[in-house]
Structures are given as C-alpha cells and as structure tokens.
C-alpha cells in the first residue's frame, strides 16, 4: 500500500544474492561473446532457476512467520533485482552505447500493483519504459530484450513505452493510466527522467483535480462491488477485488495519496485522517490480506483471488488455525477474514467521511461526490437530546464526554440517527468505537437502553441501523450472544453470508414482508397484518436471534432458545412472550423441513405438524419467520415453489388447529386454483380445459404455483399434439443457477431412477425434484439440475442428451448403469466438505407409507444410486421429495413393500438403513456398474 522502499539489503543473501547473480550474468556475457541468442537463452535459464529458488524461500518463510506483507515485499525485491540485471545485460552487453545521444535514455519504472512494492507470487508485472522523446531503435531494442526475457521466464508482463509528454497527456484523459502513474516506482535507467515524470505529474495532473479523481475511484469501487456481490460477507470472497478486500485498501490509499499528497500511510496520521489505532488497524488488515493472497497463489499455482471452499481449509491450516468445540479450523479462519473485511469497510468510511468533513467548506463539490449528502455550513441540536448535534446532516457529539456522563447515549445515538434520517459523523463513530468498554452489565440491564434498542429493531430502516451498530461493535457488545457470531461463516455451500449478516438481512426482509406489495411474500405479508399487535416485537426479536447460537457444540436451535429465555426479559418481554420467542427459535427449521421433505397430501403429516405448532397464532409467526429466514440465506434460495409449499402446509394445517374452520378451506382453495388456471386459458375449448383439469389430483392444484401450472399445460398439450410418448421441456432459472427439465412420459415404477441415472450420465447434479402423476397414468416430473454451461444453448443440448438417454433406456436400447459409470465425477467444491451420512426410517409421518429420510454429501448420481438401491431392497417408491442444501442432499422417500404395506419389522428396517448408510459413505458408488 505504501510505496515500499524495496531495499535488497533488508533481506539475506540466501533469498537472492543480487551481486553474485549479476556477476554470473557478466560471466555468461563473456562466455557467449558475439553470440547474442545463446547469451539471452543462458541468462533466461539462469535467472529463471534463481527465481524459482527465491520463490521457494519466500514460501518457506511465509509458512514460518505467516507475515504476508513481508512475503510480498520479498517477492517484489527479487523481481526488482531481476529487472535491474536484465536492464544491465541489455545496455552493457547487448546494446551498449558508448556515446549515447540525448534520445538514447530510458527509465524502467514499476507501475500499478507492482509499483506499490508488494507482489503476490502469481501477480502480473506492470512496467513503464519512459523515454525523453519519441521511441528510438536503441530504446526499442532494450525494452524488447527485457520483455522477451521476462516472458521466456514464464512471467506475465503488462507494459507501455511512452515519453514524459505522452504520459502526462494520457494521464489527464485516462483515469486508469493516472492511477498507474500515481504508484510508479523507479527500477533502473535514467533517474532524472523518472524524477521529471513525477514532478510534472504532480503539478500538471494531480493539482486541482482531487474532486474528479475521488469521484472516479469511488464510482469504480461501487461498480466493482456491484459486479462481485455487494456484501463483504459473501462466504467465498474475492481477496483482491471483493468488498473489504485488498482493492478497497488500495482505493483508500489512492484517494488519500491524491488528496493529501502523501507517499506513506503513516503520513495519514500526521494529516489527522487516521489516528494511531486506525493506522495500526490498516497495517494489520493489509498484512492479513496479503498473507491470505500469497498463500492462495502458492497453493493454487495461479493468480487465484477467490477464496473458494476447496481452498479455504488448506489456507486455514497454513495460517495456523485449529478447530475449537463448535467451530472448525476453517470457520475460525474465515471469521477472522470477515472481521478484517469489516475493519477495511470502517477505515474506508472514516476516510471518506473525513474527506467530506475537511472539504465541506473549501470544496463542497468534492464533499458531495464523496458523501452524496446535501451539506450545510451550520450545525444544530438534535431534537430530543442536548448531547448530540447535526453537523452537515450527520449526527455528532455535542461534547467529548457524552458517552462517559451517560453510557445510554451509546444506544441513543443510533436511535436518534434513525429517527432523524441522519448519517454518522466520523468523529462520532470514532468516539463510539473507543467507548465500547462502557457497554457493561449495568448498561445491558438499563431499561432505557433496552427500550431504545427495541425501538431501533422495530422501526423503519432497522437493517441499515443494525448493520451500522454491528460494524461499530455496539450490537455485539450490547447483545453479547450476537457478538459471538459476528463475522462467523458456516463452512457449507448453502449459506451465502456470515451468520451476523444473514440475521441482519433477515430483518430487512421481515420489514419488506411487513410493508407488503411483494408477490414473493403474499402469505407472510397477509399473516403479518393478522398477528396480534403485541407479537410484532416478538417476531422481530425472533428473526434477529434465530441463528444466534451457531458455532456452539449444542444444537443451535436448542441453545438459541436458552439464550432467548435469558435475554428477552431484559428487553422488556413478559414471561409468555419470552417463551414464545424461545419456542419459535427452537422450531425455526421445522416448517421448512416439513414443507420441502414431507408429503403434504398425507393426513398424518399435517396432524403431526399441527401438534408441533399448537395454535394458528404460533403457525402464523412460524410462517413469517421461515419466509424471512429462507429469503435471507442468499440469492435464488427462495423461489415460487417453496412459497407454494409453505402456503399449502399452512392452509392444510389451519383446519386441524381450528377444529375444521379455515379462512380458506381445502375445497375452496382447489376450486380457486383451478379458476385461476382457467383464467389463463380463455383460448382453450371448454371441454379440453375441463379434461385437462380433471387429469390432476388435488395435491397438484395445491402445491404447484400458477406460472408452473401454465407452463405444464402448454407443454403437455404441444407434446400430445405432436404424438410424443416422451417429451422434455427445458427452462432456465438464472437466480438459482439451475436448468429445469420437465419430463412428460408414461408412468413407470423405475421412471424416477431412470431420470436420475440419465442426469448422472450427462454429469448433471440434481438439486431438487417435483414429481407428479396424472389420473390417466402419465408422469409429469420437474427436475432441477445444477447449471454447467454459461450459454443456454449448451444447457439445452445437455438436456436433449438426457432426454435421449431416458428414451433409449425405456426402449431397452441402453443399459443405464454402464452410461452412469462412464461419466460420474464429483465436483471439486463438494470434495472440500464432509457430511455425516444419516438415514432415518419411521412409520409415524404417514398412515400408509414408511418414510425413509436420507441425508449426506451430495454428488452427481446420488439420487440414481438411492432409487436403485431402494428398488433392489424390494421396496416400491410411492413419492419422493428431493432437495439439496448446498453440499448436503436431503431426500425423503415414501415407500411400501411389494405388497403395499409399511415396513414394520425392526430387522428389515435395520437392513435398509445399513444398506443406505453404506451407499452414502461410499464416494465411488455411482461409478460402479450395477450387477
């Protein structure tokens, strides 16, 4: 980040003996005198070997001291010395000019990231060859000699050759070039030429253009975050370009360097931008991120910037993290990563706010570009408090000791900012952070502080204010249990965000549910209006706390309920509401599990769920909580199908809880669904429409969302008009990253297994399945498979291959196990995870069927293996409920024996369980042809 002084004397000769290597190159020049090509080849071979040794030494030192910046500096020093040696070889041996003309001068300069004096193992090298005037034959030869040597060494080099005049002219018009020159560093050649560039760049480009530069850099940052995902808490972060990553630190320093004309971050303390603590934080963040990035490059052997699941554990081990009860080593490492990302965000906010504050009077244009706030030159008291003022539309302290004389102000400042729609002054945020030690047991028990917190939680824009409280540390100190999950990631592919970010996002979605008007939340929004007024606060605190016990040895739902029982009385809840919050947290996964993995047309399923929820009011609250929770997991997780399943479960259960009464009884819901369907097909003849409606069982009308019903009807009609015995319709769901295959065929006892096997043979991983049978014996199944190709056309061709495989198997032309064995492989992401296999068998969830629930590590071909194994166990599959949660597959099968009876014999149940557990534990089962 600083313009590091890359002094090779700072490193031992064992790292890179520059003098000895230079002498060896001189010796090679003598050995190959007059044979330029041989000299070049010998130099490249020699320097490449030295570079390999130096990199190995840097990696060994990194593993020993885990100091990322030092590693990046070592690598940069080595690269600097290689370029200096190549420059000397070119100018002293290859193209020596004993009496150089004025034009035969050149400065070799490092730019961009390399110019900062820090270099990751697989980073590009950016060079600028500065000339006094236009290019000469000598200059071209020297530059080419250096570049070709670097390329022959296998290095990635970006380069430009310009005169000083050209550099200044282009820097004025191109922000990328301007930023690159901002971070130039002299390497070799004519030093006065480089000094001229630096001096002219400062006077002719930088002066008077701070507003333009800052606006451009902040716009670049916003666009980069938009492309990569706005949250800094995405669980596979990009270390370089992600939010809270190295590029954010770079942007921060570029802006500071440009505006304050500093060359080292330490100078920002002298300028009053950072205090000493913030500067130390800057250095710690930089070193940690460089440690991660250097290890990423060393482990992957390429310029890998994404901290993907398959690399996270190895990086954690290299950095010395160990497992603790309730938290794996990789989860502890990633928690540290996200804490650092949070600190980077805080530093960026401090710099931007400080720039605005210092420029508000002198440069209001810059102020507006940075803050996008309307500024003013006066301050006023904040309504309702003499302890705070409004300073340029930002809340600030009226006196330095406002937190000391009343610690409740540490909560009050956030509530006042929320009520008055104010941003936060950087001095206020600093004061808050420095006063966190005042949030003690006495403040946590203070009734006024807890009242203010509940107002924040249940008022407009709670998500934004809670996130600011979290970023300053107040939320985790005031709600101690929340502090334990700050920046905690869960090492799985299901959750997209850290636990604290997930909970805060869930609050945002809860507020969207309450506002209404969203088609995806129709049921939850309706229920939110109908819950008892006193339960509004109950649902808000439940949503905030439902995952607060993650990372503990005990089941997080049970542990979370215990936390709620301790915390809620302090927040002003009575005993009944405290118990309600605890119950909701303990059962917060129940509704989702039942809706997605049980047969909702089975009476026993509904009765057992009703016994759990106990009352309509509790079911309303659980439905709202479940909706917000699933929606907050990440993009594409919530969809119309899951919404419809929750809706079906809710309305199927309501009459059981009310003794037969339901706001919309079952028959009316079926009739309403059919009427809604009819309205979409006014162009169909009445007889045809009636016949089609009669082909579907009641469960279809209750469980399938309208857009899918419409697609089904058009697909079935066109397939039958074309006379197809088997038809496949392909759809794409970009939000979920899946391709949907809808298969229409004659029903067959092995059809699901055949479909699953055909998908496996094409390398397609099934993530969920919706399986329906019509009254006239046709199967209408929708299978969602993980997307493999970027283009829809390629995905469509893969779907066609799957259809052809199904048809060939049904016609007896293809032996499916052989086709599966040829293709099945597991993706590298799944290899990073370990999921304990689980199989449960019970007869309590259904009166007619035995329910087999299987859970284990997902892999291509797993559903095929399971359905094949179940059939070989002489079981009939009546229905299947297929779902994946990241790397975990959870499949539920409703089965009978060959006579149509439940499996009651304990010995037979044990044999089934043993066979399926063995299958789940075997990594290569899918690749083995069946006998």
From Swiss-Prot:
Asked whether the keyword Ligase is assigned, the reply is no
Q: What keywords does the record list, in alphabetical order? A: Hydrolase, Magnesium, Multifunctional enzyme, Nitrogen fixation, Nucleotidyltransferase, Repeat, Transferase
Entry superkingdom: Bacteria
Its UniProt entry gives the catalysed reaction(s) as: [protein-PII]-L-tyrosine + UTP = [protein-PII]-uridylyl-L-tyrosine + diphosphate; [protein-PII]-uridylyl-L-tyrosine + H2O = [protein-PII]-L-tyrosine + UMP + H(+)
A Pfam cross-reference name: HD
Cofactors per UniProt? Mg(2+)
- Per UniProt, residues of the ACT domain are 740-822, 851-931
Q: Where is this region: Uridylyl-removing?
A: 384-739
Q: Name one GO biological process term.
A: nitrogen fixation
Stretch list, region Uridylyltransferase: 1-383
- HD domain residues are 499-622
| A molecular function GO annotation | [protein-PII] uridylyltransferase activity
Extract the PROSITE patterns matched here.
ACT, HD
Statement: the UniProt record of this protein carries the keyword Transferase: yes
By what means is the activity of this protein regulated? Uridylyltransferase (UTase) activity is inhibited by glutamine, while glutamine activates uridylyl-removing (UR) activity.
| Listed InterPro entries | ACT-like_dom_sf (IPR045865), ACT_dom (IPR002912), HD/PDEase_dom (IPR003607), HD_domain (IPR006674), NT_sf (IPR043519), PII_UdlTrfase/GS_AdlTrfase (IPR013546), Polymerase_NTP_transf_dom (IPR002934), UTase/UR (IPR010043)
What NCBIfam families is this protein classified in? PRK05092.1, UTase_glnD
Q: Which family does it belong to?
A: Belongs to the GlnD family.
Its domain comment says:
Has four distinct domains: an N-terminal nucleotidyltransferase (NT) domain responsible for UTase activity, a central HD domain that encodes UR activity, and two C-terminal ACT domains that seem to have a role in glutamine sensing.
Q: What does this protein do?
A: Modifies, by uridylylation and deuridylylation, the PII regulatory proteins (GlnB and homologs), in response to the nitrogen status of the cell that GlnD senses through the glutamine level. Under low glutamine levels, catalyzes the conversion of the PII proteins and UTP to PII-UMP and PPi, while under higher glutamine levels, GlnD hydrolyzes PII-UMP to PII and UMP (deuridylylation). Thus, controls uridylylation state and activity of the PII proteins, and plays an important role in the regulation of nitrogen fixation and metabolism.
Report what the protein is called.
Bifunctional uridylyltransferase/uridylyl-removing enzyme
Provide the gene name from the record.
glnD
């Amino acid at each position: 980040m600083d313009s590091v002084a890359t002094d090779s004397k700072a490193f031992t000769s064992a790292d890179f003996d520059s003098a000895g290597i230079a002498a060896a190159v001189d010796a090679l020049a003598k050995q190959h005198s007059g044979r330029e090509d041989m000299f070049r080849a010998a130099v490249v071979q020699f320097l490449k070997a030295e570079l390999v040794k130096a990199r190995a030494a840097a990696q060994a030192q990194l593993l020993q001291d885990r100091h990322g910046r030092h590693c990046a500096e070592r690598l940069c020093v080595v690269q600097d010395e290689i370029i200096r040696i190549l420059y000397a070889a070119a100018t002293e041996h290859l193209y020596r000019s004993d009496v150089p003309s004025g034009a035969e001068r050149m400065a070799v300069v490092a730019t961009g990231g390399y110019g900062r004096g820090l270099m990751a193992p697989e980073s590009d090298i950016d060079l600028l060859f500065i000339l006094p005037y236009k290019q000469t034959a000598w200059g071209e030869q020297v530059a080419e000699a250096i570049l070709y040597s670097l390329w022959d060494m296998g290095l990635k080099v970006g380069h430009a050759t310009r005169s000083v005049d050209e550099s200044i002219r282009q820097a004025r018009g191109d922000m990328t070039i301007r930023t690159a020159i901002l971070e130039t560093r002299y390497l070799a050649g004519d030093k006065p030429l480089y000094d001229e560039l630096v001096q002219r760049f400062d006077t002719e480009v930088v002066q008077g253009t701070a507003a333009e530069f800052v606006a451009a850099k902040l716009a670049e940052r916003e666009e980069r975050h938009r492309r990569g995902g706005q949250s800094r808490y995405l669980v596979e972060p990009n270390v370089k370009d992600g939010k809270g990553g190295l590029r954010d630190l770079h942007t921060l320093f570029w802006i500071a360097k440009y505006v304050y004309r500093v060359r080292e971050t330490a100078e920002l303390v002298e300028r009053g931008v950072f205090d000493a603590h913030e500067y130390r934080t800057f250095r710690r963040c930089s070193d940690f991120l460089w440690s991660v990035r250097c290890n990423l490059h060393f482990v992957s052997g390429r310029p890998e910037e994404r901290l993907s699941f398959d690399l996270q554990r190895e990086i954690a081990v290299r950095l010395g993290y160990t497992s603790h009860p309730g938290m794996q080593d990789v989860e502890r490492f990633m928690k540290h990563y996200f804490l650092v990302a949070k600190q980077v965000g805080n530093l960026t906010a401090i710099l931007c706010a400080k720039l605005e504050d210092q420029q508000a009077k002198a440069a209001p244009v810059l102020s507006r570009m940075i803050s996008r706030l309307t500024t003013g030159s006066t301050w006023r008291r904040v309504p309702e408090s003499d302890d705070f003022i409004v300073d340029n539309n930002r809340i600030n302290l009226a006196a330095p000791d406002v937190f000391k004389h009343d610690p409740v102000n540490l909560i009050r400042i956030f509530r006042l900012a929320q009520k008055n729609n104010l941003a936060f002054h950087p001095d206020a945020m600093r004061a808050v952070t420095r006063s966190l030690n005042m949030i003690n047991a006495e403040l946590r028990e203070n009734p006024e502080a807890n009242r203010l917190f509940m107002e924040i939680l249940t008022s407009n824009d709670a998500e934004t204010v809670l996130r600011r409280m979290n970023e300053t540390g107040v939320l985790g100190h005031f709600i101690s249990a929340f502090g334990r999950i700050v920046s905690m990631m869960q090492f799985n592919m299901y959750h997209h965000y850290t636990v604290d970010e997930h909970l805060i996002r869930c609050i945002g979605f809860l507020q969207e549910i309450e506002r209404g008007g969203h088609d995806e939340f129709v049921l939850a929004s309706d229920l939110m209006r109908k819950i008892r007024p006193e339960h509004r606060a109950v649902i808000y605190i439940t949503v905030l706390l439902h995952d607060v016990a993650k990372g503990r040895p005990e089941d997080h739902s049970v542990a979370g309920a215990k936390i709620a029982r301790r915390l809620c009385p302090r927040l002003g809840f009575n005993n009944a509401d405290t118990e309600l919050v605890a119950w909701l947290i303990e059962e917060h996964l129940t509704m989702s599990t039942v809706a997605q993995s049980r047969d909702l047309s089975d009476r026993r399923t509904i009765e057992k769920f009703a016994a759990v929820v106990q009352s309509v009011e509790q079911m309303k609250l659980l439905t709202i909580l479940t909706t917000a929770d699933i929606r907050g997991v990440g993009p594409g997780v919530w969809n119309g199908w899951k919404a419809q399943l929750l809706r079906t479960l809710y309305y199927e259960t309501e009459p059981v809880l009310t003794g037969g009464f339901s706001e919309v009884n079952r028959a009316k819901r079926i009739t309403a669904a059919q009427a809604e369907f009819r309205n979409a097909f006014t162009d169909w003849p009445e007889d045809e429409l009636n016949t089609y409606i009669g082909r579907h069982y009641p469960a279809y009308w209750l469980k399938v969302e309208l857009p899918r019903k419409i697609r089904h009807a058009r697909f079935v009609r066109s397939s039958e008009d074309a006379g197809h015995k088997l038809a496949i319709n392909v759809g794409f769901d970009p939000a979920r990253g899946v391709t949907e295959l809808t298969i229409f065929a004659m029903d067959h006892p092995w059809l699901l297994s055949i479909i699953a096997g055909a998908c496996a043979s094409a390398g397609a991983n099934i993530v969920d399945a919706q399986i329906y049978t019509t009254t006239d014996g046709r199967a209408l199944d929708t299978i969602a498979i993980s997307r493999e190709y970027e283009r829809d056309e390629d995905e469509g061709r893969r779907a066609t291959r799957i259809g052809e495989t199904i048809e060939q198997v049904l016609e007896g032309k293809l032996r499916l196990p052989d086709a599966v064995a040829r293709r099945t492989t597991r993706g590298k992401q799944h290899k990073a995870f370990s999921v304990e296999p689980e199989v449960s068998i019970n007869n309590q969830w259904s009166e007619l069927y035995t329910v087999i629930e299987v859970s284990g590590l997902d892999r291509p071909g797993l559903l095929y293996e399971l359905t094949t194994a179940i059939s070989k166990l002489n079981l009939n599959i009546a229905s299947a409920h297929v779902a994946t949660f990241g790397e975990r597959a959870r499949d539920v099968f409703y089965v009978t024996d060959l006579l149509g009876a439940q499996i009651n014999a304990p010995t037979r149940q044990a044999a089934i369980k043993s066979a399926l557990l063995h299958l789940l534990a075997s990594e290569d089962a899918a690749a083995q042809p069946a006998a």
